[in-house]
Structure formats: C-alpha cells, structure tokens
Amino acid sequence: MNINLLGIKKKTVSVSQYINSLKQPFRDKFLKRKQTYQLEQETINQLKKFAEKIVIVAFSAEWCKDCTANIPVLALISEATGLEVRIFGGLQKDPSNPKRKWRIPPSPPEVKTFDVDKIPLIVIVDREGKNVGKIIEKPREKPTLEEELLKIILEKH
C-alpha cells in the first residue's frame, strides 16, 4: 500500500504538537517520560542518516500506557535526528459496537485504512510513500524503540 504523505501531513500534527496539546494529567505523564528517558546515542547517530528518507506516522491516545511510554521517545528521536514524526491522536474505543474497535469520530477514519488494532501503531514510511515497516504497541525484537526503528529501516535500506 502506498501512503499519501501529503494527505497524512494535512490530517496529523507533529509529535511535539501532539504532546503539548494533551490535557492534564496526561500531558505531564508524557512530558515526564520524555524528560527521564535516555536515548541510545550510537543508534541515534545511525538514525540521523535516514532523516531525509523516512517519515514516521503513529496512532496514539492519551489514555494508553504503551503510548505514554513510546510517543515521548518518538519525540526525543525526532528532536535528536531530524526524523519527521506525525501523529494521529485522540483515538477512542467504541464499547457500544463489539464489531468495531474504534469510534469514528473522534478517532480518525485512517484507523480503518491502516487497519489499527492496537496502539501505538508506529508506521515507518519512506518519502515515496512506501511502507517500510511498523511497530505495534512496543518494541518486540530490540530493547529500545530507537533500536527497533533502526533495525526495521536497515532491513529495507
């Protein structure tokens, strides 16, 4: 599936805008994670090489613990490397409809396009809109988010 990055940019916010727009107490939780997390510097140096080639698109909700753990790390990665990180925020479950996971709206309709089941869904896309890979909820194969991102990118580039 090719992804329309221009369309995505119009419907998303930067990761820093997303965190700053959160309501309390969620904003403080995200900011605390951002302030206390230490990036793996060697991995960050390698990720810098891909700043002009890769865009990260993530789906998030303020109430989600895995989002609280990983979206602030994406903000740090973006700041340290120049990688563009775009966020679809405000996802809400739909308890009234067992056949549908997300309530649309307020969840963006892209939850269907990207087949979002669990969050955060972190999608790595090249500048041509080709899907490079994804991380669902948290890193699975590497100990840190930045190492998992680098692993996925290196497998395709």
Where are these regions (language model features)?
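Typically the conserved alpha-helix immediately C-terminal to a functionally engaged Cys/Sec
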Residues: T68-T81
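Short active-site neighborhood of thiol/selenol oxidoreductases, capturing the structured segment around
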Residues: A51-E62
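N-terminal leader/targeting and pre-domain segments
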Residues: M1-K53, K156-H157
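The canonical Cys-X-X-Cys-His
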Residues: C64-C67, I122
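Thiol-based oxidoreductase modules, predominantly thioredoxin-like and allied folds used
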Residues: F59, L74, L83-P106
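Short, glycine/acidic-rich beta->alpha junctions
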Residues: D66-A69, W102-R103
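Non-catalytic, surface beta->alpha helical segment in thiol-disulfide oxidoreductase systems
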Residues: T113-H157
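Structural alpha/beta surface segment adjacent to cysteine/selenocysteine redox centers
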Residues: K93-I119, V125-E128
